[in-house]
């Protein structure tokens, strides 16, 4: 197996379209590529754009990454996202506040909760889509 690592820039996280030429060139230079791993939700949310720009159709290039969002859900629906971790951003924001309140009021220790242990794939994305589109997952 050959692994090609592309160095991203902070601008690519805020404007994923700026990565189109980099990703397209890497895929053109590696025509046997089977999977593209994205490092964040912004990039995975742009999976369809990356694939189409490089000449790939739905389900022709596996794309995986992190986070759920309306854009990532759209990529699942259209066949351009295949696996992502569900970090449950609502819980990531809510649990620290709950933990601080319990520590202050009850004197308890901090809550240690893994919110990113779940995975969303092509078989189960529909079960989280409504909550992801609402910004809760």
Task: For each feature predicted by the language model, list its residue ranges.
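A residue-level marker of the well-folded mature domains of exported/periplasmic proteins
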Residues: 1-137
């Amino acid at each position: 197996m050959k692994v090609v690592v592309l160095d991203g820039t902070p601008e690519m996280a805020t404007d994923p379209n700026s990565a189109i030429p980099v990703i397209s060139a890497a895929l053109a230079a590696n025509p046997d590529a089977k999977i593209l791993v994205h490092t964040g939700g912004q990039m995975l949310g742009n999976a369809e754009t990356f694939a189409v720009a490089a000449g790939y159709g739905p389900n022709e290039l596996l794309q995986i990454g992190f986070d759920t969002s309306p854009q990532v859900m759209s990529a699942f629906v259209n066949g351009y996202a295949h696996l992502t971790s569900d970090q449950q951003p609502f819980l990531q924001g809510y649990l620290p506040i709950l933990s601080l309140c319990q520590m202050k009021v009850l004197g308890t220790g901090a809550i240690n909760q893994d919110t990113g242990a779940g995975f969303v794939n092509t078989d189960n994305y529909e079960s989280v889509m409504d909550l992801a589109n609402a910004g809760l997952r």
